[in-house]
Amino acid sequence: MMSKPHHATLESIKYTPGSLRLLDQRKLPLETVFDDVLTVEDIWSAINEMRVRGAPAIAVSAALGIAVATQRKVANGELKSGSEVQAFFLSSCDFVMTSRPTAVNLFNCLRDLKEQVEKLDPTKAAAEVAQACVELAEAVYTKDVAFNEGIMRHGAAHILAVAKAEGRDKVSILTICNTGALATSRYGTALGVVRQLFYDGKLERVYACETRPWNQGARLTVYECVQEGIPCTLICDGAASSLMLNRKIDAVVVGADRICQNGDTANKIGTYNLAVSAKFHGVKLYVAAPSTTLDAKTASGNRVEIEEREPTEITTNMVTKQRVVADGPHLSVWNPVFDITPGELITGGIITEKGVQAPTASAPYYDIASIIAQP
């Protein structure tokens, strides 16, 4: 029987009607700073500059940010009719979708919102249309919390069942990046699974890759684990293969920014490395993500646009802002934020709020459309 998840103590999205504050995750763990989101430009910048990050959190923040900006414009008289409110909300969705290219949650969320807002009656008063937009945006947050709860319960129960069949009562998990409460509305996806195992007393230890160059594992995942007392070991990214060789790892559990129709998965750079090594060492790899991350319209990973960021993220110390790499005319820097893990290497399964989908025995290993179609 699956356990009920506990209440996570961390909160990166603080929302009340008319107000949105986002935790600036670039400053963690040294500083805890919340930024007010007042305009559509504010939410675009927060996403683009990675003050808010994690595919589910980006989508939720975008929806709420646009809603708050709409409310403010109605309150100060800039939007005087229902049709103006509707037009502003729709154009804001289009604008915010340009903030980052790879995570499909943002696009799925805002496209769905647009479809619903387009159905609103523009002849109604501005305040009434704005309130309807706000309620639609708030539903995005509520739904993501429920998705997190489903993912963590299904994932933990499945992984524990596999371990018990092999005679083990506790499990050790390897993960990358940050996929917890800081990356979602509350509990997390991959780290949510880890949380549930911990709450159930079944987690031996989670191993967190530091996740260069932004160090989301070292800065954020470790921060979450320390806050909740979750047993955690931080490792360098390059130590993952050696870890799987020398210590018992029951599963690699990662998040996703986009899962294509055939199971190919875009996730934080370094995930592909983990998948290759896990396959070699016989360790099951799972992808944990809400159904909003599933992209049945994109056939395979070679059709996904991979975001590349500034070279300074690699050459400059994040805290001191000093350059720590020699410079010269023949030096170039390649800084992709994501990589593509082929569905063939997702050997454990895809964990969503609907359950765990195991791979088939031969290609294509996954049928994402069939998962989406499940109730």
Swiss-Prot record:
The active site is at residue 257. The record marks 177 as: Transition state stabilizer. GO terms for cellular component: cytoplasm; nucleus. Pfam families: IF-2B (PF01008). It is an enzyme of class 5 (isomerase). One of its GO terms (molecular function) is S-methyl-5-thioribose-1-phosphate isomerase activity. Keywords: Amino-acid biosynthesis, Cytoplasm, Isomerase, Methionine biosynthesis, Nucleus. Pathway: Amino-acid biosynthesis; L-methionine biosynthesis via salvage pathway; L-methionine from S-methyl-5-thio-alpha-D-ribose 1-phosphate: step 1/6. It catalyses: 5-(methylsulfanyl)-alpha-D-ribose 1-phosphate = 5-(methylsulfanyl)-D-ribulose 1-phosphate. It is found in: Cytoplasm; Nucleus. Its main location: cytoplasm. One of its GO terms (biological process) is L-methionine salvage from methylthioadenosine. Its EC number is 5.3.1.23. SUPFAM superfamilies: NagB/RpiA/CoA transferase-like. Catalyzes the interconversion of methylthioribose-1-phosphate (MTR-1-P) into methylthioribulose-1-phosphate (MTRu-1-P). Belongs to the eIF-2B alpha/beta/delta subunits family. MtnA subfamily. HAMAP family: Salvage_MtnA (MF_01678). NCBIfam families: eIF-2B_rel, PRK05720.1, salvage_mtnA. This is Methylthioribose-1-phosphate isomerase.
